């Protein structure tokens, strides 16, 4: 009985330690100088802002802004809105809009391959939401091999590594872990 209790306590402490570090494990923020910055689709505030910040800091001379090709906001396509946004930027000549037709990060990596050919870059800096960095890096490495680094776009309203402090953070942490596990165990091998 004493041994069982000890195993239960040690197992419980191990589970708590894993849970406490699970949010931090998801986040990879290690940008390196690259040939091109690729801002992943799915969010239109923090990701583009982080990409522009890295462009201004000289991490790469070009930026690809991924935009859902078929998404509409009222009567305008997201691509039209993105074009108008880019035209108003001082860095407009360094930015290319990359239309994304897929609905998953894996599909997005396949769509990006065509856009990368036009900017000829082997060293790619991915920009995505902080919680999405580890999975995105793994997916791009598998689907579209290149020399990748990744930069996290932080949004405290959406996620924090101390995920237990806010309900929304806990939901995002749980959802991203499900997606990461599914990618590693199933989708990666298709």
Q: Where are the predicted features?
A:
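A transmembrane-helix-recognition feature enriched in membrane-embedded lipid enzymes
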Residues: 165-190
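N-terminal type II signal-anchor transmembrane helix
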Residues: 1-28
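Structural signature of transmembrane alpha-helix termini at the membrane-water interface
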Residues: 20, 24, 51, 181-188
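A structural signal for short, hydrophobic/glycine-enriched beta-strand patches
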Residues: 23-167
């Amino acid at each position: 009985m004493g041994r069982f209790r000890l195993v239960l306590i040690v197992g419980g402490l191990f589970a708590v330690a894993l849970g406490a570090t699970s949010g931090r494990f998801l986040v990879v923020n290690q940008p390196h100088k690259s040939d091109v910055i690729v801002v992943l689709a799915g969010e239109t505030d923090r990701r583009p802002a982080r990409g522009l910040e890295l462009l201004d800091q000289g991490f790469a001379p070009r930026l690809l802004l991924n935009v859902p090709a078929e998404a509409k906001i009222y009567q305008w396509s997201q691509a039209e809105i993105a074009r108008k946004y880019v035209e108003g930027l001082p860095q407009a000549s360094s930015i290319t809009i990359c239309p994304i037709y897929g609905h998953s990060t894996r599909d997005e990596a396949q769509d990006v391959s065509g856009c990368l050919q036009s900017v000829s870059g082997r060293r790619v800096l991915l920009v995505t939401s902080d919680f999405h960095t580890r999975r995105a890096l793994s997916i791009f490495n598998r689907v579209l091999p290149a020399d990748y680094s990744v930069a996290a776009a932080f949004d405290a309203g959406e996620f924090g590594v101390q995920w237990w402090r806010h309900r929304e953070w806990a939901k995002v942490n749980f959802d991203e872990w499900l997606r990461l596990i599914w990618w590693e165990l199933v989708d990666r091998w298709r």
